[in-house]
């Protein structure tokens, strides 16, 4: 599988100490969309501060399944999950 077809689960720290979870093929691009107000409705009212973590998947289906599981976690559990992820380049 080429890197171009990879999907990523990503978590954003947002204002109000909240965490947004989503999937994309390009975390840096998607983070920029959230910052510009063109991302999800959630991040229009709770501005993103930084990318907490990201995890690569080979297929969109795998990423969607992981997104559903992560969205069920509490904020504390999501932060613990991110703390265990391998270090990645920050989204710009």
Curated annotation (Swiss-Prot):
Disulfide bonds: none annotated. Residues 5-80 form the GIY-YIG domain. CDD domains: GIY-YIG_UPF0213. It comes from the Bacteria. Transmembrane segments: none annotated. Belongs to the UPF0213 family. This is UPF0213 protein H16_B0156. It comes from Cupriavidus necator (strain ATCC 17699 / DSM 428 / KCTC 22496 / NCIMB 10442 / H16 / Stanier 337) (Ralstonia eutropha).
């Amino acid at each position: 599988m080429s890197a171009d077809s990879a999907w990523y689960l990503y978590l954003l720290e947002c204002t109000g100490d909240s965490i947004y979870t989503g999937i994309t093929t390009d975390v840096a691009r998607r983070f920029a969309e959230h910052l510009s107000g063109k991302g999800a409705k959630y991040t229009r009212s709770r501005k993103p501060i930084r990318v907490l973590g990201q995890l690569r998947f080979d297929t969109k289906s795998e990423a969607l399944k992981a997104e559903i599981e992560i969205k069920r976690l509490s904020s504390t559990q999501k932060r613990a999950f991110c703390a265990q992820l391998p270090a990645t380049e920050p989204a710009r």
